[in-house]
Amino acid sequence: MELQRNFFIFAFLFVSFLLWQAWQSQSLKKNKKNEETNSFFHLNHKKEDKNQIIIKNDVLRLVINMYGGDIEEASLLDYKTQLNSPENLKLLETKSDFVYQAQSGLIGKDGLDNSINKIRPLYSAKKNFFELGHNEKELRVPITFIAKNGITYIKNFILKPGKYNVEVEYDINNLSNKKLELNIFGQLKQTVKLPKNRDIYSGNFALQTFRGAAYSSSDAKYEKYKFDNIANHEHLHIITHHGWIAMLQQYFVVAWVPDTNISSSNIIYTSYLDNDGIAIIGYKSSLINIPSNSRYIIKSKLWIGPEKQQEMALVAPNLDLTVDYGFLWFLSQPLFKLLSTIHNFIGNWGFSIILITFMMKAITYPLTKAQYTSMSKMRELQPKINELKKNFGHDKQRMSKEIMALYKKEKINPLGGCLPVFIQMPIFLSLYYMLIGSVELRHAPFLFWIKDLSDQDPYYVLPIFMGLTMFFIQRTSSNNISDPFQQKIMHFMPFIFTVFFLWFPSGLVLYYIVSNLVTIIQQKYILSNFKKNQKR
C-alpha cells in the first residue's frame, strides 16, 4: 500500500511539473506599463564589410560596425555551436534571417546618434584588426569621430585576457564654447523567432530553458521578461539608480551594465520592431552635462559570454542570478557548488554526479529506513486491516476510525512512507535545473557513448536501464498490493517513466539510475533486518 501511494505521489508530482513547464512556456506575463517607444530604439545600421573592424582576445572575437560602433557579431572561442563541431559559437550575429546586436551610443540634444533622422556617426580607426598580444594585460581599441564643431568623440573598447566583459568607454573632448547635453544608452536587440540552425532544442521539451530579456533594478534584484510580452507591446519603463539589462538563452547571456557614477538614474525600457520581429531591451541615462572646454569620460560594461556565476558576480551585483535554475534555485545553487567541489578532485562530471548521489542517499537514509520499516509493519498488519474491513465494511466512518486506532496501537504512521517522496522530488527537480542550466556541464563527457551529460542519451541506453531498475524496485515490493488492477498499473509505471526520461539530460538519468541501485541495496538491507528483528 505504501509503495503504491509513493509511486502515485511521485508520478503526480512529476506530471504536474511537466504540465507546469508547458504552461510557463505559453503563458504571458501581463503588462507592467505601456509606454510610447522613442525613435532612438530603432536606430538603423549599415552592414558593410569595409566599415567593420575586428577585435579579439583569447576568448572573444568581436565584429564592430563603424556606423555607431555597435557590436554586430561576437564569437566565443572556447565554445562550439554543437558537440564535435569545428565552428565557434556566435552569441551575437547579424544575418538576413536573424539579428542579435549590442548597441550603444549618445543621444539627446547634443548626442551623436541623432534620434530625428536616425543617422549613426561613422567612426574611424587606424586599422581593421586588433588582437590582444600574448603578454599584454589589456587591449584598448579607440574609434574616433570628430564633429564639425570641433568636438572629438572617442569610443574605446577595452578587452582583457580571459575575460568576457568588454568595457565600452566614451572619451568626449568638448573644445566648443558651449555646454553639451546628452544621454548614453545601451540596448540589446534580437530577432524573436529563431532560425533552425540556432534552435537546436526546439523538439525537446526537457532541455529547453528560458530565452528572453531580464533586468536588475533598485526594486528587483532579478526579473525575467518574456519576448512574448515585448512582442505584445507590454513595455517596461523603469526608473532605477543601479542595475543592468540582459538577454538570456541556455548557458549564455549578454548584459549591459551602466556606470551609475555618471548618472543619477537610468531608465530601463523595452521596445519591439513589428516589421522585423525584433525585441529590444535597453537603458538610457539621465541627462549628462559636459561643460565647454572640458573632457568627460563615460563608461559602461558589456558581458558577452557563458553564465559563469563567480565571474559574473564580479562584473555586477546579481548578474550571477541569470543562471536559470528555476523556482528551486535555492537548492540548485548549493548543489552545483558541491558538485563543482567534487569535480575539482575527480575531474569527471559524471563520476561527480554519482558521488553526489551517494551523498544524497546517505543523507536521506533515515527517511528511507522509516519508509520501508513502515511498509513492512503495514504488511504485517494487513490481515488485521482486512478483518476490520470485513467487520465494518458497511460503516465506512467506523471502519476508518478502527483502522486509525490500530495504527495508533501499533505505533505506525500511515503517512510515514510518503515523506521520502516529497524530499526526493525537490532534489530531483533541482538537479534537473542544475544540469540544463550550468554551462560547465555543457558538452561534458562521461564514459563511452555519453559525450554530453547535459543532452539526452543518443542511444537511449540509460533511460531503458533506469526503467529496469525502477521495475525491479516496485516488483520486489508489490506484495503490498492485493488488487490485480492496481498491480498492473504499478507494473506499467516504470514504462511511463522510461518514455519520459528518453529526452531528459543523460546526467539526470545517471543520477536516477545510481539512486535506484542504492535504493535496491538499502531496501534489501532494511527489510532483511526487519525480518530478523521480528523473529526475535
From Swiss-Prot:
Keywords: Cell membrane, Chaperone, Membrane, Protein transport, Transmembrane, Transmembrane helix, Transport
Coarse class of the protein's main subcellular location: membrane
Keyword ATP-binding among UniProt keywords: no
Topology class, membrane: Multi-pass membrane protein
GO cellular component terms, A-Z: plasma membrane
Gene Ontology molecular function terms on file: membrane insertase activity
Protein's UniProt keywords contain Cell membrane: yes
Ranges that cross the membrane: 7-27, 338-358, 419-439, 453-473, 494-514
InterPro entries in UniProt: Membr_insert_YidC (IPR019998), Membr_insert_YidC_N (IPR028053), YidC/ALB3/OXA1/COX18 (IPR001708), YidC/Oxa/ALB_C (IPR028055), YidC_ALB_C (IPR047196), YidC_periplasmic_sf (IPR038221)
Cellular localisation: Cell membrane
Any single biological process term in GO: protein insertion into membrane
UniProt family annotation: Belongs to the OXA1/ALB3/YidC family. Type 1 subfamily.
Role noted for this protein: Required for the insertion and/or proper folding and/or complex formation of integral membrane proteins into the membrane. Involved in integration of membrane proteins that insert both dependently and independently of the Sec translocase complex, as well as at least some lipoproteins. Aids folding of multispanning membrane proteins.
Entries under PANTHER family matching the protein: CYTOCHROME C OXIDASE ASSEMBLY PROTEIN COX18, MITOCHONDRIAL, OXA1
Matching NCBIfam families: PRK01318.1-1 (NF002351), PRK01318.1-3 (NF002352), yidC_nterm (TIGR03593), yidC_oxa1_cterm (TIGR03592)
Complex and partners: Interacts with the Sec translocase complex via SecD. Specifically interacts with transmembrane segments of nascent integral membrane proteins during membrane integration.
Name of the molecule in the record: Membrane protein insertase YidC
Protein encoded by which gene: yidC
